[in-house]
């Protein structure tokens, strides 16, 4: 689950991490009121969307010369003007795609006199099974270009979670940032605080960009992104309440209500599979046969008729879907139960695209009989390769 910048900063502040004063706003009036509570005379007005590149982004509804989603304001009047331009308009960044995201929230913060900018992030390094701490002296809006053009300026420090954060990790961070004296000590302390927050909150990613050194010699978190492991939200009810569903794909939100793991993709073949590994293999073989998957959808090990029906409805809400491939291995789940769900769902949604079903496992023959006697134009498949070839052929024939 992704958090907005102001939400992430609210959480980090609880760990004693230095954060510039700021206030979230849903309206122009709230933005102005928030700015009046800050020392000034400089303010920063930030669009709050779940995407990076806001500073270099452009608003669809504004002219090409308009400012982006992060703006410096030199007065309360400037704050008001920026808030009026940003709220309700669509911000397009390198991470949103051409469709952009509508700005519904702002974050007004106090301006900071910046001496230097750095980059510091933490991610789950799945290859090593450790936490990867990524550090660079080249923080700011161009960090992606730095990673591409001068990767030697980026240092990665791995931390074994079984061992935890050790003093030498903090020293390594400070050394990578080329800090000395009091700033060196601040960096070591900050690295430990961030690691503690990362582990306590079950983060998948925590990015500080930029981490800034102020003119008076303080390290402050100027901007941050935070992503929480959705499977751990039951441990963080306060964090779960921060979820902003308006920033998420509506189909993915609906799928989560039925405990379906759904991710929309750009292809034309809808997929309904049980098990993440089998789902990925199914998508791979669809591509191998010259088509592209329209989604990842894992119905899990306890699919019911209700869940299968919901899955079909979610898949068919995507106008790009031209056919559906169902690939089920019945272990805990019985194939006859799945077949009954498929028949009920196909009739309820008035399926009008080709449907290929491959069943294997417990009660597979009963499942195949149910499909064969359903009176629906369901195409059976014997194995994964056969299923992929058939759905691609059916879609081409129906085109």
From Swiss-Prot:
E.C. code: 6.2.1.5
InterPro entries, per the entry: ATP-grasp, ATP-grasp_succ-CoA_synth-type, ATP_grasp_subdomain_1, Succ-CoA_synthase_bsu_CS, SUCC_ACL_C, Succ_CoA_ligase-like_bsu, Succinyl-CoA_synth-like
Superkingdom, taxonomy of origin: Bacteria
Any GO MF annotation of the entry: succinate-CoA ligase (GDP-forming) activity
Cofactor annotation: Mg(2+)
Regions that span the bilayer: none
Pathway per the UniProt entry: Carbohydrate metabolism; tricarboxylic acid cycle; succinate from succinyl-CoA (ligase route): step 1/1
Classification via Gene3D superfamilies: ATP-grasp fold, A domain, ATP-grasp fold, B domain, Succinyl-CoA synthetase domains
Disulfide bonds: none
Domain ATP-grasp: 9-254
Recorded family membership: Belongs to the succinate/malate CoA ligase beta subunit family.
PANTHER family recorded: SUCCINATE--COA LIGASE [GDP-FORMING] SUBUNIT BETA, MITOCHONDRIAL, SUCCINYL-COA SYNTHETASE BETA CHAIN
Assembly information from the UniProt record: Heterotetramer of two alpha and two beta subunits.
NCBIfam families: PRK00696.1, sucCoAbeta
Record's protein name: Succinate--CoA ligase [ADP-forming] subunit beta
Organism: Erythrobacter litoralis (strain HTCC2594)
């Amino acid at each position: 689950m992704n958090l907005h910048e102001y939400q992430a900063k609210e959480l980090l502040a609880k760990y004693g991490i230095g954060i510039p004063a700021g206030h979230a706003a849903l309206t122009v009036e709230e933005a102005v009121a928030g700015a009046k509570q800050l020392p000034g005379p400089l303010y920063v007005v930030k669009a709050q969307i779940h995407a990076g590149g806001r500073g270099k982004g452009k608003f669809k509804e504004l002219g090409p010369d308009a400012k982006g989603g992060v703006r410096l304001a030199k007065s309360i009047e400037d704050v008001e003007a920026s808030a009026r331009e940003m709220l309700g308009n669509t911000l397009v960044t390198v991470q949103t795609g051409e469709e952009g995201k509508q700005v519904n929230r702002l974050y007004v913060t106090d301006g900071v006199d910046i001496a230097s900018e750095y980059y510091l992030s933490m991610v789950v390094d799945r290859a090593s099974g450790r936490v990867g701490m990524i550090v660079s002296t080249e923080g700011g809006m161009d960090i992606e270009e730095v990673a591409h053009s001068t990767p030697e300026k980026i240092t990665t420090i791995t931390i074994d979670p079984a061992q935890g954060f050790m003093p030498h990790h903090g020293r390594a961070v400070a050394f990578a940032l080329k800090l000395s004296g009091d700033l060196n000590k601040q960096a070591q302390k900050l690295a430990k605080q961030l690691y503690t927050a990362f582990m306590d909150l079950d983060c998948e990613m925590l990015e500080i960009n930029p981490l800034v050194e102020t003119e008076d010699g303080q390290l402050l978190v100027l901007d941050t992104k935070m992503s929480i492991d959705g499977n751990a939200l039951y441990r963080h009810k306060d964090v779960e309440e921060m979820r902003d569903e308006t920033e998420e794909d509506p189909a993915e939100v609906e799928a989560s209500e039925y405990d379906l793991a759904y991710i929309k993709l750009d292809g034309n073949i809808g997929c309904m599979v049980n098990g993440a590994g089998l789902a990925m293999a199914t998508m791979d073989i669809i591509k191998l046969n010259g088509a592209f998957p329209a989604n990842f959808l894992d119905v899990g090990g306890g699919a019911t008729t209700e869940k299968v029906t919901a899955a079909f409805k979610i898949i068919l809400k995507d106008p790009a879907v031209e056919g559906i491939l169902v690939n089920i291995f019945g272990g805990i789940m019985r194939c006859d139960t799945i077949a009954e769900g498929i028949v009920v769902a196909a009739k309820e949604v008035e399926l009008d695209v080709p449907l290929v079903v491959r069943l294997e496992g417990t009660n597979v023959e009963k499942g195949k009989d149910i499909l064969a006697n359903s009176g629906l134009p369901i195409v059976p498949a014997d194995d994964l390769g056969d299923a992929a070839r058939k759905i691609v052929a059916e879609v081409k024939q129906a085109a």
